[in-house]
Amino acid sequence: VVPYGLGSPRSKRALENLLPTKATDRENRCQCASQKDKKCWNFCQAGKELRAKDLMEKGWNNHKKGKDCSKLGKKC
């Protein structure tokens, strides 16, 4: 229990209770309350696409630095 300001103490929120448990849920930026909410849906999907792009770029940068070519016996 932790105090929050001048009000009554409240229980501490555990981070593991807030995180999704399924692997597919972790891929999404967020979850919309309504599937008909187009703005929310676009925002959540945009985060997923940006993370995929970042991962692809990181992999390519490592490849250019020669980190992924060690099995070939050459530097890229």
Curated annotation (Swiss-Prot):
The keyword Repressor is annotated on this UniProt entry: no
Main location: secreted
InterPro entries per UniProt: Endothelin, Endothelin_toxin_CS, Endothln-like_toxin
Name this polypeptide is given: Endothelin-1
Keywords in alphabetical order: Cleavage on pair of basic residues, Secreted, Vasoactive, Vasoconstrictor
Gene Ontology CC terms: extracellular space
Described purpose of this protein according to its UniProt entry: Endothelins are endothelium-derived vasoconstrictor peptides. Probable ligand for G-protein coupled receptors EDNRA and EDNRB which activates PTK2B, BCAR1, BCAR3 and, GTPases RAP1 and RHOA cascade in glomerular mesangial cells. Also binds the DEAR/FBXW7-AS1 receptor. Promotes mesenteric arterial wall remodeling via activation of ROCK signaling and subsequent colocalization of NFATC3 with F-actin filaments. NFATC3 then translocates to the nucleus where it subsequently promotes the transcription of the smooth muscle hypertrophy and differentiation marker ACTA2.
GO biological process, one term: vein smooth muscle contraction
Compartment(s) of residence: Secreted
Gene Ontology molecular function: any one: hormone activity
Region called Endothelin-like, residue ranges: 30-44
Similarity-based family: Belongs to the endothelin/sarafotoxin family.
